[in-house]
């Protein structure tokens, strides 16, 4: 058994003992039993009631989920400024909006492309939402290339237009596709390619990686809205509900 497996088994057995006490299986005078006798009683109870194992695993998962939620909320408070006010992150919507959505995305993520349409719908119906875009290229070198190109477009004041065009593109974005789209929307592509190597782009990607890992995001898209974390695609209606909750909590 691996060290991780041993630790997991110990945690399960501990949870089982906790459940056994809850179910009242301990005998009168159990406080006087030896450790070996307590373990034997626990084993007998588990053999008679195998369902205890499943309940113990569920209990561990609930505890882990609760601990992760507490950790995430603490991190949100500590990282609020970096999440919502990073000058190195592009913005959409109302720059003075009363609620900020932070979106983590990858240009080669099909769900992100669909999510962009949902976010655009929200922005069309709620004029008081501010969006921070955290480019998180996790789907290979082509995604990194697309991210570098889009962030470099900020120097030509065409980020939003380029971002929307990249998200509207069908299929996987290879470097040639990215440059073709850049040229089509009027970007100076030689300048764009030179700007793609800027240190601020490296910093944006690194910050996105750090924040996503700290928030336990495992894929794209993912959102932070107020105190809520939303991994996965979210519909415009659900985004609006989360925005309303964040607004009401202010």
What do the predicted segments below correspond to?
Residues 2-3, 7, 15, 21, ...:
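N-terminal targeting signals for export/organelle localization
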